[in-house]
């Protein structure tokens, strides 16, 4: 991916301002420049493709006008048809006395699967019995048990995994097709000097007789046979299949069975990662076994009763692009225990050493991940209230996840609840939310537009040179930030859609996610 060269324009023509023409603007950005297209040595290589200009209902970044289906990347299937023998997809080390350790490939007899995310299982290898995470296993002799089968992961996630520059040509996975029910898709990494590393997708169709094929001249009775054949012969594919796409273990749903309100003594705070107005963030260990992130809140920040009630809702929000809430210590000082993200906050990541290597394709991809998580929040009728780069966390391979959703409304600090106090993030907040307290998913959309400027400026504070009071006044009178340097006009226009005065005229996160799809992926038969 890359950006298109913008025609020289007067900077005033690059703004989506609603101010009168004679208004004085502060902190304007210079006109767009062509970004450096040299990919960083430790980031995904992507072919250079141009960003199109905006038209009515545009496909800004090579995407569709409808979003990808977002599903959890769990590969394990539920018990069906009386199947009780499962195979382990990953290694698992027990975290409590009631857990069962097992190795990848181990066969397990499910004793009782009515326990939600944790099933009681008996190992046919060790003879031991205990609870296991249900998303770490799949029915024996099923397609889900194949290492190359990734199930309902999105097309976008398959591309992110395959575009790792360490993957050799021909690295592949099989997933469910998002466009045709009952069909599958073979996704394969390819490379050439003109396009660089790219991904090709081949639809696997199903015969009425039960067989499978990519081209009708070569048919197979099973997906396993299809994969075995194309591992030996390219036969029309971009390359023969070489390596199964590597992937990391999924997060378990919770720390363990019945581990929600946990004792403070079960947590060890080890490395302080950051500090804010309302508390600290630590890397730590739960129960001496499990790496976690721990957010400690200063006493008085919020009511423990209100927090626990909100946390019950938050823990039900599960999506691959949301930081998972694992457990809580509900007595003051409140502790919030979540999955650990190794690269810290997006804001620090952008401003740090790695930020200088990020190019526009990676930044757009990160924006798309955030939009994906927020599209789920949107579907769940939830509101974040504090969406900004400081509340996005980064993991390995530039994975981004939305954090701290819903906590903002519980804060009781006067400097925050006044909405114009020193601690309130006024520069990220929609006018109707800042002035009248009307926080909705549409005010989150406004904040996402501001977050896009943080991405494209590598963490620069929005509205440079302006104080909070001036920002609120100018925005209310129609001012909108101009296009940042090296940002394509099409992306700036997307920001401006997020900053429309009428909240109902702002786009949905589903729409934003679709517009931010990568232009680096080549379409083949899907």
From Swiss-Prot:
It catalyses: L-tyrosyl-[protein] + ATP = O-phospho-L-tyrosyl-[protein] + ADP + H(+). Residues 7-25 have a biased composition (Basic and acidic residues). One of its GO terms (molecular function) is non-membrane spanning protein tyrosine kinase activity. Residues 148-245 form the SH2 domain. Coiled coil: none annotated. Its EC number is 2.7.10.2. The modification Phosphotyrosine is found at residue 416. Pfam families: PK_Tyr_Ser-Thr (PF07714), SH2 (PF00017), SH3_1 (PF00018). Keywords: ATP-binding, Kinase, Lipoprotein, Myristate, Nucleotide-binding, Oncogene, Phosphoprotein, SH2 domain, SH3 domain, Transferase, Tyrosine-protein kinase. The phosphorylated form is termed pp60v-src. Transmembrane segments: none annotated. A lipid is attached at residue 2 (N-myristoyl glycine). Belongs to the protein kinase superfamily. Tyr protein kinase family. SRC subfamily. This phosphoprotein, required for both the initiation and the maintenance of neoplastic transformation, is a protein kinase that catalyzes the phosphorylation of tyrosine residues in vitro. This is Tyrosine-protein kinase transforming protein Src.
């Amino acid at each position: 991916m890359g950006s298109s060269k913008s025609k020289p324009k007067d900077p005033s023509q690059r703004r989506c301002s609603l101010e009168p023409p004679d208004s004085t603007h502060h902190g304007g950005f210079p006109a767009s420049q062509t970004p450096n297209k040299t990919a960083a040595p430790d980031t995904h290589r992507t072919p250079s493709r141009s960003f199109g200009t905006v038209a009515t209902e545009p496909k800004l970044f090579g995407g569709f006008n409808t979003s990808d289906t977002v599903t959890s990347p769990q590969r394990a299937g539920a018990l069906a048809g009386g199947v009780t023998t499962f195979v382990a997809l990953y290694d698992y080390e027990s975290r409590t006395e009631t857990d069962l350790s097992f190795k990848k490939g181990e066969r397990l007899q499910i004793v009782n699967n009515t326990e939600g995310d944790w099933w009681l299982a008996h190992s046919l290898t060790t003879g031991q019995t205990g609870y296991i995470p249900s998303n770490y296993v799949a029915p024996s002799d099923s397609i889900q048990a194949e290492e190359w089968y990734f199930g309902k992961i999105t097309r976008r996630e398959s591309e992110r995994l395959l575009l790792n520059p360490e993957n050799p040509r021909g690295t592949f996975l099989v997933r469910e097709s998002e466009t045709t029910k009952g069909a599958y898709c073979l996704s394969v990494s390819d490379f050439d000097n003109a396009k660089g590393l790219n991904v090709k997708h081949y639809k696997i169709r199903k015969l009425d007789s039960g067989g499978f094929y990519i081209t009708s001249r070569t048919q197979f009775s099973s997906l396993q046979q299809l994969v075995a054949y194309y591992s030996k012969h390219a036969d029309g594919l971009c390359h023969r299949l070489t390596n199964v796409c590597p992937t990391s273990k999924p997060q378990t749903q919770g720390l363990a069975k019945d581990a929600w309100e946990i004792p403070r003594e079960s947590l060890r705070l080890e490395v302080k990662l950051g500090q804010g107005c309302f508390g600290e963030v630590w890397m730590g260990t739960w129960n001496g076994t499990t790496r976690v992130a721990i957010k400690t809140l200063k006493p008085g920040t919020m009511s423990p009763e209100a927090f626990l009630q909100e946390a019950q809702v938050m823990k039900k929000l599960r999506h691959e692009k949301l930081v998972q809430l694992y457990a809580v210590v509900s007595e003051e000082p409140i502790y919030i225990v979540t999955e650990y993200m190794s690269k810290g906050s997006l804001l620090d990541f952008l401003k740090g050493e790695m930020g200088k290597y990020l190019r526009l394709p990676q930044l757009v991809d990160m924006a798309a991940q955030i939009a994906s998580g927020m599209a789920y929040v949107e579907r769940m009728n939830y509101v974040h209230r504090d969406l900004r780069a400081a509340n996005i966390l980064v993991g390995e391979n530039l994975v981004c996840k939305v954090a701290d959703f819903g906590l903002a409304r519980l804060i009781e600090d006067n400097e925050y609840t006044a909405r114009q106090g020193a601690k309130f993030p006024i520069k990220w907040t929609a006018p109707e939310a800042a002035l009248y307290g009307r926080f909705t998913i549409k005010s989150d959309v406004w904040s996402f537009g501001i977050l896009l400027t943080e991405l494209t400026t590598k963490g620069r504070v929005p509205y440079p040179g302006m104080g909070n009071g001036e920002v609120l006044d100018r925005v209310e009178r129609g001012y909108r930030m101009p296009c940042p340097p090296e940002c394509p006009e099409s992306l700036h226009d997307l920001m401006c859609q997020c900053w429309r005065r009428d909240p109902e005229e702002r786009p949905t996160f589903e729409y934003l996610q679709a517009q931010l799809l990568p232009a680096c992926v080549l379409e083949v038969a899907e």
